[in-house]
A protein has these predicted regions:
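Hydrophobic anchor residue at the start of the ABC signature
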Residues: 51
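Catalytic Walker B motif of ABC-type/P-loop ATPase nucleotide-binding domains
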Residues: 62-65
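Conserved H-loop
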Residues: 91-97
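Conserved ABC ATPase "signature" region
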Residues: 8, 17-33
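Conserved ABC ATPase signature
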Residues: 37-41
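C-terminal coupling/interaction segments
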Residues: 168-212
Length: 212
């Protein structure tokens, strides 16, 4: 059975008459898959198929649980960009469960951070970032020379290969960036890095606790 027939059967519709379904298929560039057998679809194409079926329900509240699990980075990125674009001007509420921070940065405006079943933090993304990271962070490679260069500034918890510097205000940010630029150090600025924010939220949650 072709993907087209499976889709029409599940949705109880006919593609040639369903303008909304046609629009979703065009939006996700899925037209070339319609005459294939489902087993012949790639992982990314199967995820598109599932997402189209979900979106056709027009639900006020939709759960996406690890929707890009098993896909390569490039396919994940393209799929999440498409989802973010589709929902941008809509009033639907999405609950997205993901271990990929870049997905949450694209789709989420509120976060619930869990660790081993414990609620670490919950709130608006911007408020959580400010609470655990500051106004902005500057991220650079973790090298001996870089550590020495920024030793007088506040370093946040971060992945081992990175240094993340907290900037409490514009003046501090300008002071740090001036030093980095003067010393020809590559860096990235962020005011929404969910990975580093989550690491520091966990650090604050477990600080002083014996049940880590």
């Amino acid at each position: 059975m072709s993907v087209r027939h499976i889709m029409e059967t599940i949705l109880n519709t006919r593609l040639r008459k369903d303008k909304e379904l046609q629009r979703l298929i065009d939006f996700f560039e899925f037209g070339s898959c319609l005459d294939k057998r489902f087993a012949a679809l790639s992982g990314g194409q199967k995820q598109k198929f599932t997402i189209i079926l979900v979106m056709m329900q027009k639900a006020e509240l939709t759960f996406y649980d690890e929707v890009t699990s098993g896909l390569d980075f490039e396919t994940r990125q393209r799929l999440m960009e498409k989802m973010a674009e589709w929902y941008r001007d809509k009033e639907n509420t999405l609950v997205v469960v993901s271990h990929y921070y870049e997905e949450l940065e694209q789709l989420a405006d509120k976060l619930l951070i869990l660790d081993q079943g414990r609620v670490i933090a919950c709130g608006k993304k911007e408020e959580l970032f400010r609470a655990y990271c500051g106004k902005a962070i500057l991220i650079l490679e973790n090298t001996l020379s870089n550590r020495d260069l920024v030793r007088d500034f506040t370093a946040l918890k971060s992945p081992d290969h990175l240094i993340a510097l907290s900037c409490a205000d514009r003046e501090e940010e300008e002071r740090i960036t001036s030093i980095l630029i003067r010393n020809n150090v590559n860096f990235k600025r962020s005011n929404s890095d969910i990975e580093i924010m989550s690491i520091n939220a966990k650090e604050a949650f477990y600080e002083g606790r014996e049940d880590k």
